[in-house]
Amino acid sequence: MPDDVGPAEAEVSGAVSESDNEYDETEATTKDDDEKMAERSAASEGVETNGDQKKKYDPKDPLRPRRKKARRACYACQRAHLTCGDERPCQRCIKRGLAEACQDGVRKKAKYLHDAPPEALRPVLGPNYNPAAAVSVRNGHRHPSNAGSDAGSSVGTFFSQSTQYPVFSSAATQLGSIPENLPFPQQSPVSPTFQASGNPQLGSIGVNSVSSPMNSFPPALFDPSNPAIFNFNLEGLNFGSQYGAMEFGMLGHMSSGAAETPPRDPSISQQGTAGDVGFNPSGVFGNGLNQFDKVYDNNTGLMSDFLTLDAHSSGLYSQGNLQHGLPHAYAIPAGPTSLQSPSTENNSPQPTGFGFESPTTTNYTGVPGAGGNQPGSQQSRTQKPKTPALGKLGPQSVLGKRQRDPSSIYEAVKEPFQYVASFHKLISLLQNRFSGASTISIVRSLASIRPSFMSCMKTLNRADLIFMEKSFQRALFEHEEFMHQSPSPAIACRRTGEIAGVNKEFTALTGWTKDVLLGKTLNLNANMGGTNSDTLSVSSKGGRGGIVGTTPRLKPLNPEQGPNADGQQQQSQQQKEQPQPVFLAELMDEASVTQFYEDYAQLAFTHSRGTVVRKCRLLKYRTQENMDAAAAAASSVPTTAGGSGSSNGTVVNGGPDSSPAGKTERERSTGANVASNSILSNRVAKIDGEHGISKLERDGKLECSYTWTIKRDVFDIPMIIMINFLPCYYRSHNQLAV
């Protein structure tokens, strides 16, 4: 009798176990968990649980044995909302008789992964995940045998021994005439550049025809932190840190779809078409140090072909006005062997024979009229004569690498800048050069912002002041690059008005050299903004224009100073002994400086993003020898009705010497040597020539329009003043247009 009861009990237990697979909302999951923990602990100790009483554990007991959470539940435990284990098959599936069908379940996809293809998530789901396997559930009954057979067959199909990764989706027919040993040297399989539905030739490529074995491919194929997943060549980008290069590369990767897809010539063979979508696994994780050597080779490189372009040649894929065939917009520079998706060799219209061919185009059978793909044309391109500019070019000059490291700023600055001493020098300069009314107006403007300076500076210590100077030098480092690339004359000043940066255009306009402005050489300027007689009167009357009744001069306590105790002579003697940076007040006339400091008082602390647009008069750099020579030349020239000599010795345009017949031999020789003595390069010799921007002056002054703004530091204190100038042209002044 007991033998007859055994199968019945087994059937009953099997039915009960089948019903346990179903999820019951009213059943408490904690009870089932406690039972499973008791069964597992008893099985580990070798205790028979068939006839023994199961030990109950209090769910609130802190000393009860806890189950280790699994990284991913199996399909059955996931549907039953039960805790699973890491082993496969798990203990619960073994007990229920579902050992063969036990596999990892499918998690719900996050919102940001809804657009990701399932293939991109497969390597992360573990080795037991089978997307094709599904346990059929109909009317509360399961079919474990069918599920197990389906799972066993499908798992073997996806994770076979020959690991082949498909390059394109298998939604097309097979393509014939593709050789087995087809090289794949260029593109990465994860590159989103090519779409299977957009190109009929590429869309017809099957999975098995293009797939190449990659047994050494690392498991972390879709690691977002790996820059190779988006083909970013961080070493080819001009960035000091990896984070900035990654962000810049991602922006270029997102904007790569703005360029047009290059047209395909129908005569190109299918072998060359498939070569564009190849993949070289050794190139993704290489350092890429030798990639740009091939680009900038003087004989066979890309720049050799680029510098020898014929402007009248028409390429195969010329687009209207874009005859040179370069791409519309590409933010990332790419070489012939680089791995970036927005590459100028693969994604842009390519004129043949101009050196912009992709390396994979050497596999093409031939394009009518394009001889750059044949080995003979490669040999002919190597025999092209060198251009003079090739010797100056290289990977560093073309990529625009920085010549100095900004980290040296933080190592060089050890002391804070003495702004108090600079303000005292500024007040002394204003008292010596300008009249009492202008000096008082400027001092009142500075006094209006003095409380704001004091409130911002009272909590700063020495470390803060050193950090303030480092911030200024770092900001000046960036602005100097902008000024060198700007076509307009520009200068950068401290908040005291001292010149800290200048470009070549300002030097060509005013004659003030960079060494004089930055205080590296002595300032020998004698042009104070007036005529010769006015300058002499200012010098003879103590530099105040003869105005009496203002702030008196205090005599020094040391009687040994002798005749230099007058103030201005003593200061001029000290300035000759020690060079110092030029103040902005020395570059403008009196009215312009007064107006500048009135605007400075309004813009220093009130409008953080405000700008000022005014007109001013810049002073040309004239030494005393130049002033005397110009005065002697002006006195020797007779005045006529057609023109008159200027007060500072410069002949006004329109006089007798302005005509070609009136030019002396010395002036002709000077004009012939302009290109060699030009402040700017030879390409803009006419701008810096006889009638260029260096000649736009009247009485030693330049009429200019200028705009400036203030950049503050982290303490909300004015840090750097950026000023841009543009010379004004007036026909009534008989000036010659540039």
From Swiss-Prot:
Biased composition (Basic and acidic residues): 28-39, 51-64
Family: Belongs to the ERT1/acuK family.
Occurrences of domain PAS (ranges): 475-546
Keywords, ordered alphabetically: Activator, DNA-binding, Gluconeogenesis, Metal-binding, Nucleus, Transcription, Transcription regulation, Zinc
DNA-binding region of this protein: 74-102
InterPro entries listed in its UniProt record: ERT1_acuK_gluconeogen_tf (IPR050335), PAS_13 (IPR056751), Zn2-C6_fun-type_DNA-bd_sf (IPR036864), Zn2Cys6_DnaBD (IPR001138)
Protein name: Transcription activator of gluconeogenesis SMAC_06113
Region (Disordered): 1-65, 255-278, 328-404, 530-579, 636-673
Function: Transcription factor which regulates nonfermentable carbon utilization. Activator of gluconeogenetic genes.
Cellular localization per UniProt: Nucleus
PANTHER family the UniProt entry points to: TRANSCRIPTION ACTIVATOR OF GLUCONEOGENESIS ERT1 (PTHR47659:SF1), ZN(II)2CYS6 TRANSCRIPTION FACTOR (EUROFUNG)-RELATED (PTHR47659)
Comp. bias intervals (Low complexity): 568-579, 636-655
Entry-linked SMART domains: GAL4
Chain intervals with Polar residues compositional bias: 337-351, 530-540
Domain of life: Eukaryota
